[in-house]
Amino acid sequence: MKNLLLLALITLPLVGFSQLWNQVSNFTGEGRHHPITFSNDNYGFVMSGSNLNDAHKYDKSNDTWTQLQNVPFSSRNYSYGVNIGDKAYMGFGYDLNGQFPTDWWQYDMNNDSWLQLANFPGSGRLHPAMIVVNNKIFVGCGNNSSGNLGDWWEYDVLTNVWTQKSNIIGNNRHHPYYFGIGNYAYVGFGH
């Protein structure tokens, strides 16, 4: 009895800190590997992946999925995207032709429109780090047919200009962890 009471005292406080999951509407598109995903306060977006070129929007207000116009770039895997406000920026990956594209795109979430931006001037890649800090997007690491990469780039969304920065300290890598806090980008680990 004492053991049971002790177990209850230990586990009861943890119940209040457990996560609660709710099922939402199932995704209406085809299942996929490594799509581009991003969101704003109202919608979540799933685009491309598994060499598909479709795009979908999830509306949390009515728990529905809507298929949008197809992405204007070649379908690809391992692409990445981030957003600043209601604009998403995306590129990179690996396409059906075995290429590592360097095209760079802006997607307007409010009116489902696309704008091709300045191409990435470095080597195409998959699994890069992509971090937003203020109005700049930092991209680096990743890998391609040459192996792991360690270069680091800054994209200014206000001027549509890419600038190469100092390479990452340490080993070249792909698929690292990454995040931005305040005015700093943090990157580490990876393969």
Task: Label every PLM stretch briefly.
Residues 1-20:
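Bacterial Sec-dependent N-terminal signal peptides
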Residues 18-191:
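Kelch-like beta-propeller repeat domains
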